[in-house]
Structure formats: C-alpha cells, structure tokens
Amino acid sequence: ELKPLEELSKNLWWVWNSDGKNLFRELDHDLWRKVGENPVMLLQQISSKRLEEVLADERMMEKINATYAEFKEYMSKPMRNDIPSVAYFSMEYGLCNCLKIYSGGLGVLAGDYIKQASDSCVPMTAVGFLYRYGYFAQSLSMDGQQIANYEPQNFDQLPIEAVLGEDGQPMILEVPFPGRIIYCHVWRVNVCLLYTSDAADE
C-alpha cells in the first residue's frame, strides 16, 4: 500500500508539485528537515512505527493515493511528436537541494529548462555529470578562517537510478583520454529524462 511513495521518491515531479512535497513532509516533519528534503533518505530512515501509523490513518492514505493518481496522470501525457526531439547538455543542473549537481544560477536555469520541457511534453533528453562531492559546505575555524568541507554524495540515497545494459548489468561508458581510459557509470534522473555520468572508476 505504500509502494507509491517509493515511485514518487524516484521522480523529481515532487520538486515543483506542492502536493508531492507536502506529502513527504507530512510523513515525518522532523526527519524531512534532517535529511535535507530528500525523499529517498526519508523512506530509508523513517521508523516502522510511523509507517504503521500512516497505514492506519485513513486521511493520510487518501492523500497518498490522490497524489499518486495526480502523478500518474501527469506521467501519462504523451510527448509531442510535432517538433524535433532535443538533446540538452549542461555541466550542472539545479533540480533540488538534495541532488548536488549544480552550484549557481546557470545550473538553476538549466534545471528550469528541463522542468518546463517536462511540463510542456517536449521530447528532451538532458545529459550532465553526477558529481561525487557536489559543492562544499562552509564552516569557520577557531581563528575565523573559512573551511571548505567536501562531503561525498551517497548515490544509493539519491533520487537517481543506475542505467542497466542489455545484460542487466550497470551500463559503463569508456571515454578515451590521452594515455588512459575513463570508465563512467550512467545514471538516470527522472524529471523529463536526464542522464548523468560519474567517473568514479578508472
């Protein structure tokens, strides 16, 4: 009965849909803030007791089902076939705070482009990078010096999915560089259709 929550957590539709965001917030207000408004982490860390309470709450279950129905209706809209498909490339995408693949205004602009493409049913596939460390968090030392703290992103806790090849194994791209080959994993972010790659293996 709670499976719709998992599907909703893996699609960034909730980012710009107030019903979706409010649904996750209402599951556990304190935990939602603690996990940085990350629905994947929320579902991973929410207590079994709270889930039992949700299942027993008729109003909450109606809200889950209504939000999921709204999401499925949105996803059922066909892509336009009267315009060319679009390939969009950017170094960063500002989609949500929990997916640290942007650092400024241009990334937010790129994120808005693909959100609008999704709303407008434009057949767009976006390609970018999945940064392991994202942007840094700032802190101050005892003597007032700024310290840059780089915390690695745990890809298993993000609203992303590994792209699999025909053999069912994670897809890996080989990118030739001078004197070496970079091996990149391919990940999918469900918003319109955004593919990112990380080069953790070499």
Name each model feature, range by range:
Residues S118-F136, A148-Y150:
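Hydrophobic or amphipathic alpha-helical targeting/insertion segments
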